[in-house]
Amino acid sequence: MRTRLLTATTALALLFGAGGAYAGMDEAKAFLDKEIGDLSSLPRADQEKEMQWFIDAAKPFAGMEIKVVSETITTHEYESKVLAKAFSDITGIKITHDLIGEGDVVEKLQTQMQSGENVYDAYVNDSDLIGTHWRYQQARSLTDWMANEGKDVTNPGLDLADFIGTKFTTAPDGKLYQLPDQQFANLYWFRYDWFNDEKNKADFKAKYGYDLGVPVNWSAYEDIAEFFTGREIDGKKVYGHMDYGKKDPSLGWRFTDAWLSMAGNGDKGLPNGLPVDEWGIKVNEKSQPVGSCVARGGDTNGPASVYSIQKYLDWMKAYAPPEAQGMTFSESGPVPAQGNVAQQIFWYTAFTADMVKKGLPVMNDDGTPKWRMAPSPHGVYWKDGMKLGYQDVGSWTLLKSTPDDRAKAAWLYAQFVTSKTVDVKKSHVGLTLIRESSIQHESFTKRAPELGGLIEFYRSPARVQWSPTGTNVPDYPKLAQLWWQAIGDASSGAKTPQEAMDSLCAEQEKVMERLERAGIQGDIGPKLAEEQDLEYWNKDAVAKGNLAPQLKIENEKEKPQTINYDELVKSWNK
């Protein structure tokens, strides 16, 4: 998840819970009255029925002290401060829900995986690690768990089909390894008011020959960025783009979070490109990673990837505020809300709650935003059938090294905080939607005009093109850390985009080579291919009906295309 720095909350551990003697239906009813009310997809009688199931299932574990961990974002703060206490009061299981930094969560997880010691009883861990969990086989398959040891503590009302993110937490073996707890997409953000201003529209049409609107491709995004940069609006000069460029770990996910796929890197396929994904990592028919560099059939340093880095650098230099180059993710995040940026191509919906606060320069007096979010534009190498952006899915993960009874108690809590009883209310607090029943709830229909397009997007057929990192990545923690260093060299000017990506793919292959040599991931671990040239692998891909690695397109400035935002939303509702 990318928002660990959005809140200034320090790491916090809250121990809640009443003794088992006090747990029960009275506590459940008090919780439903005070906290849930009508904000549930279940009617009150069914809420009480679900609470009774939790009370009964928890009896063997009453009085146990269970520790779970997640990163620090609004959704998890709500779980830690409100839902953990409610669960403890209702079930008698004492829950400590720790909130720590995203990197620290991964560190604790790795410590437990490497040592076998039970550090936490459950983790909310990014589904970006699905390929890691499947290959190391240290996380419990939830499919097997729910059918066997965990059967007696699996909520009959869990309704997995209602979760919109289970495709992302399912491995190539068809088994579910993680249960989504919160998710958010990375979309295009723009000033709806400026785009609908008659003078802006007329001036843009006169200069570029087409209508100002939501850019469908990068070519139009570039024109719009150029048009607004230096333009005076409400007495101040504005910028056509916002980004960040400091060589810092947060620069890594600016790219691993599907920037390359937005450009057209990798193959077609949803939720992720196959056989080559958006990291440029190729797998064979046995899901073994065979390479990252174009020399082995990968695409990390292919023309589409290099183009994506070049555009990132060009736009930041020409159209973003000068300070953007030296900013980190958390420093750049609040800038669009200050009112001098026209659009941002890489914007997380997790920012929504902070962007709709009353009194901000980007808010109207009636409580509606002056901005909207829309699907991301795509680069010149992108083809229909490819993913179009990133979606973060923080998911409950149970490790095999956690004793069964502790895993059972933690699994009850994981199901409680994602249950139909509480999910609508939790979604209103954190705006990180995970259930179809919550997305369609009438309370979100009412609130939608205040959320800048979030609900319209999640109700649209377009959302399937936004997905997390997929199963091609064999060891997310080891590989992800290579990205910010390599791209930092391009951002600082120490290397060209081609040199930076050549170096990145080589470093990724070194990690894969070590994994292959160690044999630690068995017959689904890396098996590096023989080296050939780009033309060889492109011809091979095309012969098999695939794309990657694509050859360089000589003219990377394609015909610009835009769409009217309101027409786009109408088309979703047809």
What would you call each of these model-derived segments?
Residues 25-60, 127-187, 370-375, 547-572:
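Hinge/lid segment of periplasmic solute-binding proteins
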Residues 50-57, 74-94, 189, 193, ...:
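Short, polar/charged alpha-helical segment
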Residues 51-53, 65, 368-378, 428-491, ...:
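Long, aromatic- and glycine/proline-rich binding clefts that accommodate carbohydrate-like moieties
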Residues 85-162, 198-199, 203-205, 335, ...:
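Extracytoplasmic "Venus flytrap"/periplasmic binding protein-like
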Residues 100-108, 216-220, 323-338:
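Short helix-initiation/N-cap motifs at beta->coil->alpha
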Residues 127-139, 143-147, 163-210, 222, ...:
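Periplasmic solute-binding protein
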Residues 170, 174, 317-322, 331, ...:
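Extracytoplasmic/periplasmic substrate-recognition and gating elements
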Residues 220-226, 263-326, 376:
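Glycine-centered hinge/linker elements that transmit conformational signals in sensory
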